[in-house]
Design a protein with these regions (language model features):
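Catalytic cores of RNA-modifying enzymes
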Residues: 1-200, 204, 250-263
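C-terminal lobe and adjacent flexible extensions of AdoMet/dcAdoMet transferase-like proteins
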Residues: 206-263
Length: 263
């Protein structure tokens, strides 16, 4: 039983889950097996913790690269497991440089979900199966016009196709988080190239997601280094009277391209 194994390791090494690392160990064998079934070939695991998912991935995949920044957990992984096909790397994933994998399977720390995901978007892999906070996952898949449609929704749609596979209750973890989680399946599918102007446009628009476009851009004019005189320049901006939260990614790209022409 995984819970028994968890408490054995915690007691043996006199450790407890670290709040600073947002550690909630996934202990549901059902969920672990479900996630591991999506791993194949060379798989990346971010934050292996005490190795419960790592162990299952090692049996299903050709090679596992497990990146863990907690030195105590790295030492435990190396002492407790004798993996032939697992490389345990002590590093902060946000600084990790290797980019080519067949799949990614991970229960990632909720506190850095956005940073981890956007780093993954710049890597090369076929699919990623990731465990997120449920609310975060819903923002990922939200569409124009929906309540959760956000900057995160826009960027995820540009880089990928995402579906939520299943929800996971707090009881699947130790310690139990206060929120439900969701397993998301990501396939890279970049729709178009983006630049700094596009990223600033998205940030400017969704800072005022309920406003109409020309007002949202004007009220965020400092993002573009502009003053009050910028208002007159926005008379011909595309979709000027549309509410920001109704725009799809291609309409936002039109707005960005137009802004790039006048900045």
């Amino acid at each position: 039983m995984i819970p028994d194994r968890l408490f054995y390791l915690l007691n043996k090494y006199k450790i407890s889950p670290s709040k600073s690392f947002s550690q909630n160990f996934l202990i549901s064998d059902e969920v672990l097996r479900f996630m591991a079934s999506y791993g194949k070939g060379k798989v990346l695991e971010i934050g292996p913790g005490l190795g419960f998912l790592t162990e299952k991935l090692s049996k299903a995949c050709d090679k596992v690269v497990a990146v863990e920044m907690d030195k105590n957990l790295v030492n435990i992984l190396k002492q407790e497991y004798n993996f032939d096909n697992v490389e345990i790397v002590c590093d902060d994933f946000l600084k990790f440089e290797e980019k080519n994998f067949d799949t990614v399977v991970s229960s990632i720390p909720y506190a850095i979900s956005s940073q981890v995901t956007f780093k993954l978007f710049e890597m090369n892999f076929e699919t990623a199966t990731l465990l997120y906070q449920k609310e975060f996952a819903r923002r990922f898949i939200s569409n124009p016009g929906e309540d959760d449609y956000s900057r995160l929704s826009v960027m995820s749609k540009i880089y990928s196709e995402i579906e939520v596979l299943k929800d996971v209750p707090p009881s699947a973890f130790y310690p139990e988080p206060k929120v439900w989680s969701s397993i998301a399946h990501i396939k890279l599918d970049k729709k178009f190239e983006i630049n700094d102007v596009f990223e600033n446009t998205v940030r400017a628009l969704f800072t005022h997601r309920n406003k109409i476009v020309h007002k949202a851009i004007y009220h965020s004019r400092d993002i573009f280094g502009k003053g009050k005189e910028f208002k007159q320049s926005l008379d011909e901006i595309p979709y000027k009277d549309r509410r920001v939260y109704t725009l799809d990614i291609f309409e936002i790209k039109e707005i960005s391209d137009w802004l790039e022409g006048i900045l």
